[in-house]
Amino acid sequence: MFRIVKWLIALPVGIFIFFNAYVYGNIITYRAVAPHRTAFMSMRMKQFEQEGRDVALDYRWVPYNRISTNLKKALIASEDVRFAGHGGFDWGGIQNAIRRNRNSGEVKAGGSTISQQLAKNLFLNESRNYLRKGEEAAITAMMEAVTDKNRIFELYLNSIEWHYGVFGAEAASRYFYKKPAADLTKQQAAKLTALVPAPLYYADHPKSKRLRNKTNIVLRRMGSAELPESDTD
């Protein structure tokens, strides 16, 4: 009996250690090499296949300096205004999310920073529970410890979902505007950023009033967004 209990404890611990060792190795690799595809992309494409959707993956990696400053500022203004200065976690946002989750009785809000969103996109699935949030936090801490802010942002910009099968700034810019991501205007960058929280909903509701309102909010805020200090774009 004791041996069974021992194995029941050791097995999940071993899996946890192995997974995090795998993740850390990939984080080191991604400091210099672009991901072939992310865990979130794979999950999403499998979901589309199960739903009977004929969707092809459109994912085009481009370097940081070939993405418009307008899009960078718009995303920071909307998704993580303190990105340049924090260590991966916005503690005020996390506290607010905990309060909202406690009031709702389930995990709905995450208070996620750009770094946390990237951790999820690269390695995790879309489930919402405290165990997954804990793993997300561990991955975020590892990533922030060994990866500079520009590289984190570059990985994020290239892995965001924007439409059915459309991932990354370059694919999104060419899908919506038939131009490279380097040439996005402020209005176009704000519109793309407004799609980020719910890209598939807006794919099905492109004339949503909520989308127009969010675009205008991003436009007003993006001028004051602070990019990472080493940004030379």
Curated annotation (Swiss-Prot):
It catalyses: [GlcNAc-(1->4)-Mur2Ac(oyl-L-Ala-gamma-D-Glu-L-Lys-D-Ala-D-Ala)](n)-di-trans,octa-cis-undecaprenyl diphosphate + beta-D-GlcNAc-(1->4)-Mur2Ac(oyl-L-Ala-gamma-D-Glu-L-Lys-D-Ala-D-Ala)-di-trans,octa-cis-undecaprenyl diphosphate = [GlcNAc-(1->4)-Mur2Ac(oyl-L-Ala-gamma-D-Glu-L-Lys-D-Ala-D-Ala)](n+1)-di-trans,octa-cis-undecaprenyl diphosphate + di-trans,octa-cis-undecaprenyl diphosphate + H(+). Belongs to the glycosyltransferase 51 family. One of its GO terms (biological process) is cell wall organization. Its EC number is 2.4.99.28. Peptidoglycan polymerase that catalyzes glycan chain elongation from lipid-linked precursors. It is a single-pass membrane protein. This is Biosynthetic peptidoglycan transglycosylase. It is found in: Cell inner membrane. Keywords: Cell inner membrane, Cell membrane, Cell shape, Cell wall biogenesis/degradation, Glycosyltransferase, Membrane, Peptidoglycan synthesis, Transferase, Transmembrane, Transmembrane helix. InterPro entries: Glyco_trans_51, Lysozyme-like_dom_sf, PBP_transglycosylase, Pep_trsgly. GO terms for cellular component: peptidoglycan-based cell wall; plasma membrane. The chain crosses the membrane at residues 8-28. Pathway: Cell wall biogenesis; peptidoglycan biosynthesis. One of its GO terms (molecular function) is pentosyltransferase activity. It comes from Neisseria gonorrhoeae (strain NCCP11945). The keyword Nucleus does not apply. It comes from the Bacteria. It holds the Pfam family Transgly.
